[in-house]
From Swiss-Prot:
Organism: Coxiella burnetii (strain CbuG_Q212) (Coxiella burnetii (strain Q212))
Cited Gene3D superfamilies: 3.60.21.10
Reaction(s) catalysed (UniProt annotation): P(1),P(4)-bis(5'-adenosyl) tetraphosphate + H2O = 2 ADP + 2 H(+)
Classification via InterPro entries: ApaH, Calcineurin-like_PHP_ApaH, Metallo-depent_PP-like
The keyword NADP is assigned to this record: no
Keywords, ordered alphabetically: Hydrolase
Function as written in the Swiss-Prot or TrEMBL entry: Hydrolyzes diadenosine 5',5'''-P1,P4-tetraphosphate to yield ADP.
Family: Belongs to the Ap4A hydrolase family.
EC number(s) stated in the UniProt entry for this protein: 3.6.1.41
Enzyme class: hydrolase
GO molecular function list: bis(5'-nucleosyl)-tetraphosphatase (symmetrical) activity
Lineage: Bacteria, Pseudomonadati, Pseudomonadota, Gammaproteobacteria, Legionellales
One Pfam family of this chain: Metallophos
UniProt name for this protein: Bis(5'-nucleosyl)-tetraphosphatase, symmetrical
Amino acid sequence: MDARAINSREKADLKYPRNTYIIGDVQGCYRELQELLELIQFDSTKDRLGFVGDLVNRGPNSLEVLRFLKSLSSPLIVLGNHDLYLLILGYGLMPEDSYEHTLHAVLQAPDKLELLEWLRHCPLIRYEKSLSAVLVHAGLPPQWNIKESILHAEEISTALKGPHYLAFLKNLFGNEPSQWKEDLEGQDRLRYICNAFTRMRFCDAKGHLDLESEGKTNQAPSRFRPWFEWRNPQEDNVDIVFGHWAALNGQSSAPHTHALDTGCAWGYKLTAINLKTKERFSVPWQSALRM
């Protein structure tokens, strides 16, 4: 099922989809994405797709992934740190050779600006009330409830969609401030919010971020834990669906949290979850198809 198949159909009204499937970090693995859609028997006229960010980079086909997702009818998409990195590169705010990446085809594409425009209008959080679920790339820090998280994510959306988005993106990278304070202002405030939603793995009970550690949950530095171990599922009363942390291999120890990054771009698999039934589907990395 490719983008042409989607485009050839009349886009359906998906207000009441048959199924809603959320897919983990695609990271440019277009062929695996298509294999996964075949596995779940995705029907664009009846089903809805969602993605927990990191749509691009590391895998070989980021351009094809973006074009395909843009063709979908009302997909549920949140941004990840690699997607923000593409925006920074795409708008010329950082030299293309600053870091190793696989985004060259996107950066040279004739529809680059159209794709970037579409991407920066995607949010950092999606709350699906009908399914009692929140989509976010990295996670939700413990000091914010669901409502507060949504409001803070909207601050980033406002910056990305506003007239000064280039200045916001240019100064986005950095690990500080790592501690949330209500009186944070300007770029410091936005950087913390963005890091929490797109880069966080370990934090302390007050939302102090450790952005250096990337290992398994038992490798947390002193006083830090995986963000989901601090949250109160009774207070949240929703399912939190996230990606970003490939070392978890799709496993989360906390109730009502669903980890979907199963390391496809690292040679493992791409995973989807049916939000209604919680059934999971996975396809392996197609190494034989790599160029």
